[in-house]
């Protein structure tokens, strides 16, 4: 009983934090969280995936065959609806 209440309370707190971060003006928390989840060692990226998942911005572009995602600021494969 105590464990289930603790897990429920922890889940609600986590939900509150994510909702607050997504509604904040800066909206940096979800982006940093996703970037850290999908970030990997640079040797692994070059070996297995090319430059998929590299961080990018206006000045630092991506490898050929990839585009910079305007939302998440990492390199993705071009597809429908992506520039």
Curated annotation (Swiss-Prot):
Q: Which Pfam families match?
A: Toxin_12 (PF07740)
**GO molecular function per UniProt:** carbohydrate binding; ion channel inhibitor activity; potassium channel regulator activity; toxin activity
Q: Which UniProt keywords apply?
A: Cleavage on pair of basic residues, Disulfide bond, Ion channel impairing toxin, Knottin, Lectin, Potassium channel impairing toxin, Secreted, Signal, Toxin, Voltage-gated potassium channel impairing toxin
The answer to keyword Signal applying to this record is yes
Where is this chain's protein located in or outside the cell?
Secreted
Signal peptide as annotated in the record: 1-21
- Secreted keyword on record: yes
- Cystines in this chain: 51-63, 56-68, 62-75
InterPro entries recorded for this chain? Huwentoxin-1 (IPR011696)
SUPFAM superfamilies named among the record's database cross-references: omega toxin-like
Give the main localization category: secreted
A GO cellular component term found in this entry reads: extracellular region
Family in the record: Belongs to the neurotoxin 10 (Hwtx-1) family. 51 (Hntx-8) subfamily. Hntx-8 sub-subfamily.
Q: What does this protein do?
A: Weakly inhibits 5HT3A receptors and Kv1.3/KCNA3 voltage-gated potassium channels. Agglutinates erythrocytes.
What is this protein's name? Answer: U5-theraphotoxin-Hs1b 1
Q: What high-level taxonomic lineage is stated for the organism?
A: Eukaryota, Metazoa, Ecdysozoa, Arthropoda, Chelicerata
